[in-house]
Amino acid sequence: MSTIVITTHGTLGDNLPYIALGKALKTRGHEIRMVVNEAVYSYVLKAGLEAFTSAHSRIGPEEVRGNAQLWNQLPLLKAKSKDKTKSVIKKDDIIDGATPLLKVCHGADMLISDSEQDIFAAVIVDVYDISWVRSRVTPFSQGFSDTKIEYHPYYKSWLNTENSKRFILAASPHFCPLSPEYSHVHQTGFWFYEDSDWSGGEPSEEIREFVEQEPKPLVLSYSSQPLENPQEIVEVHVRAADKLGRRILIHQGWADFNQSHLPSDIDRDNVMFANGFIAHDWLFSRAAAVINHGGIGTIARSLRNGCPVLVEPFAFDQFFNALQVQKLKVGTAMDTEKLTADRVANFLDKKVLTPDYKKRAVEVGEKINAEQGLIAACDLIESWLSS
């Protein structure tokens, strides 16, 4: 048995694939220690893994909702005069970030880091005789070569993967193949998280009856994306669903979508709000389309179930993921600054809810389902442990 430390950063959606990896490695007899932000502690413990606090501030629903404007990068991307200010990482920042890892990695055999933690993981590798595996759960950066991105010089050495033979990309090549310069990266397929509460397979009777009616409902799921204007987003989508004669299930998520956001003139029998976790495989396999923010986990799960998507991106890798959806013709994407009920309804009608888009989503989903991302990752990791 080996002791493996996994360190991650980000919101819940960023952490769940790593929790899934930790569970898979534990079933193979390894001791797993996870260094995460405090907001995802409960998910780590629920998976039967050891949880340790990272140096990062808590990133939970309340924290991100309080700074929702920081999670909307579209205005900055559209600005004619880009902000050229570059962040500077100080020595103290690196020490602070690496200190929790130093304690947890003592006596461990391997450290697995997501890309946000690489700069701290590199410090650990210099201190301990420990195997290091780098990783990403989104193909952004490794999936293209024709887009120019400026990084602070300090980051460039950590972004470079050419000298890293132990780098795993937990995304499907059927969603985004690697560009040639990243051919050395091991692409395993997606790491799907399965919650123990999903083992029953079906949600409450109320949700089941709502979802299983015809025509199939739309699903609005922004997952851990916070919003400055959740009421406006809800109103646009319930009105769009009404125009299409569709019911809509809205997942509360970190935007805190709720009944108070509904306009008074909407038939509430055609709208349902869902709190907490729902078995996504059950839900998405019964949905007409999943409207989402472009998170890689939500898109992957939708396609796994042959469900086309409408992507409404706000920040980070979401724009790249939206582009891939359009390239694959498994759905489309919209400018989130131009969301209206008429436009959303039209995009859904013409570029999501058609037989061709459904057929393509099913085809891609079958390829994704044929992959065994977690098994492939565990096999790689164990081969590196023994080498």
Across the structure, where does each feature detected by a protein language model lie?
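Nucleotide-activated sugar donor-binding and catalytic core shared by glycosyltransferases
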Residues: 3-33, 39, 43-50, 157, ...
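Short glycine-enriched loops at secondary-structure junctions
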Residues: 138, 254-255, 315-317
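Short internal beta-strands
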Residues: 32-37, 248-253
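Short, catalytically relevant binding-site loops at active-site mouths
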Residues: 225-227, 255-257, 298
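Nucleotide-sugar-dependent glycosyltransferase catalytic domains
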Residues: 38-246, 260, 359, 363
